C-alpha cells in the first residue's frame, strides 16, 4: 500500500511510513505475526468470514479486530508486498493526529478488552509473545522517550548556554552565545534516537525493495526523520488519555 501522489512534506512523511509498513508486514507474515489487515485491498476467504461471523463494530478499528479474530481462530494471514494499491492520506497535522489517534486507541481497546488472552500466550506464537507486547512497549516507550527527551534537551540547552556564556578570556561581562561542536552532549537518549532512526530508514529501504517501488524516497525519508518524532507523541499521548478516561471520538 502506497500514498497516492504525495506532495507536501507531511504527505511525504506518511509515504515513508507506509513503505516502512510494507517491510514490517513482510517480516511479520513470515512468522504469522500480522495483527491488522489494512482496509484497502485486503482479501478474505468467504468461508472464513462466514465461520467467524463477519465484521462487527470494534472501536473504529474493524480491520484490526478481524485480523486478531482470524489469528485467534488458528488461521494464517499472508502478505503480498508487491500488490499495488494506493491510499490518500491526511493533508494537515490535526487530521493526521485524529486518524492516528483512532488507529492507536483501536489497537489498545481491542487488545486490552476482547483479545487480551492473546497477549503473552505461547499458543499464538510470535503474535502473542512478541508482536502484541511490543505494540504496547512502543506506545508507552514512545511517550516516555518524548518526555525524557524534552527534559534532557532543556537541561542540555541551559548547560550549553551557561558554558558558552563564560567570562574566561573575554573582555566583556555580557553573555555571549556561540555554537561549539565540543559542547554537543552524547546522551543515552541521543544514542537511542539515532539507532531507532537508522533502523527505521533501513526498514523503509527494505520496503522499497520488496514492493518494487521505483520513485525516489529522499524527500519522504527527510520528512519521516524530522517530522514524525515531532508529531507522533501527540497522538500517542492523546490515545492513552482517551483509553484511560473512556473518551470516544467521532470518525472524522
Language-model segments: residues:
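Catalytic donor-sugar/metal-binding loop of nucleotide-sugar-dependent glycosyltransferases
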Residues: 58, 67-86
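Long helical/loop segments within the catalytic core of UDP-sugar-dependent glycosyltransferases
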Residues: 1-59, 101-108, 112
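Basic/Trp-rich segment in TM-proximal cytosolic loops or flexible interdomain/linker regions
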Residues: 91-95, 99-222, 243-252
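Active-site donor/metal-binding and catalytic loop motifs
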Residues: 3, 80-96
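Hydrophobic side chains within well-formed alpha-helices
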Residues: 9, 66, 93-96
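Hydrophobic, aromatic-rich membrane-embedded alpha-helical segments
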Residues: 222-240
Amino acid at each position: 500500500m502506497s500514498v497516492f501522489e504525495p506532495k507536501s512534506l507531511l504527505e511525504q512523511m506518511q509515504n515513508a511510513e507506509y513503505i516502512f509498513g510494507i517491510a514490517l508486514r513482510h517480516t511479520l507474515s513470515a512468522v504469522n505475526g500480522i495483527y491488522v489487515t489494512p482496509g484497502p485491498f485486503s482479501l478474505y476467504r468467504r468461508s472464513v468470514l462466514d465461520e467467524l461471523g463477519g465484521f462487527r463494530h470494534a472501536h473504529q478499528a474493524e480491520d484490526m479486530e478481524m485480523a486478531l479474530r482470524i489469528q485467534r481462530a488458528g488461521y494464517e494471514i499472508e502478505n503480498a508486498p508487491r500488490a499495488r494499491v494506493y491510499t490518500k492520506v491526511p493533508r494537515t497535522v490535526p487530521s493526521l493526529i485524529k486518524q492516528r489517534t483512532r488507529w492507536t486507541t483501536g489497537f489498545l481497546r481491542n487488545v486490552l478488552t476482547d483479545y487480551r488472552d492473546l497477549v503473552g500466550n505461547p499458543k499464538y506464537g510470535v503474535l502473542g509473545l512478541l508482536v502484541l507486547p511490543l505494540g504496547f512497549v512502543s506506545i508507552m516507550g514512545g511517550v516516555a522517550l518524548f518526555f525524557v527527551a524534552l527534559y534532557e534537551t532543556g537541561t542540555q540547552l541551559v548547560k550549553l548556554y551557561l558554558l558558552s556564556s563564560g567570562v574566561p578570556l573575554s573582555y566583556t561581562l555580557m553573555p555571549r552565545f556561540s555554537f561549539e561542536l565540543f559542547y554537543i552532549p552524547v546522551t543515552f537518549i541521543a544514542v537511542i534516537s539515532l539507532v531507532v532512526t537508522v533502523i527505521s530508514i533501513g526498514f523503509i529501504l527494505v520496503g522499497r525493495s520488496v514492493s518494487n517501488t521505483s520513485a525516489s524516497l529522499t524527500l519522504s525519508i527527510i520528512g519521516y526523520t524530522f517530522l514524525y518524532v515531532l508529531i507522533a507523541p501527540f497522538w500517542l499521548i492523546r490515545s492513552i488519555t482517551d483509553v484511560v478516561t473512556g473518551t470516544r471520538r467521532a470518525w472524522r
